[in-house]
Design a protein with these regions (language model features):
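C-terminal non-catalytic regions of proteins with extracellular/luminal or membrane-system context
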Residues: 1-122
Length: 122
């Protein structure tokens, strides 16, 4: 399928609508918005959950021409930097478990994540 200018315009409109439609249930300690560090460097974040890789935004009858998961969206940001080791563990889990399911958290080093990351996205 060729991507047209009109499709690109629609993608921008859809992105803006999705961003405006996100519901924040509780913003404890002003966690959001995630901002860069004081020196301007991206904020290191731990992103949890296998749905970070391919966020379901469509029903089974639709085939989107473009879909961006949570992890890829955050990685493209200049504001935050997802933890690469944690992302690799989730990608490996997804490849080894194509039937789905959530990765057990018992294999994660939460002490290292707490030390290396300033925020967590679940």
């Amino acid at each position: 399928m060729d991507i047209t200018l009109r499709m690109s315009d629609h993608a921008l409109t859809a992105r803006a609508a999705a961003a405006a439609g996100i519901v924040l249930l509780q913003n404890k300690n002003w966690t959001l918005p995630l901002l860069p560090q004081e020196d301007g460097a991206p904020l290191p974040v731990a992103v949890f959950g296998v749905k970070q890789l391919q966020t379901p935004a469509f029903d089974k009858t639709m085939t989107p021409w473009r879909s961006i998961g949570v992890l890829d969206g955050l990685a493209a940001s200049e504001t935050v930097r997802p933890d690469a080791l944690l992302a690799r563990k989730y990608r490996t889990w997804a490849v080894e478990h194509p039937e789905g399911g959530e990765m057990p958290l018992t294999n994660l080093d939460f002490g290292a994540l707490r030390h290396d990351c300033a925020a967590a996205v679940v």
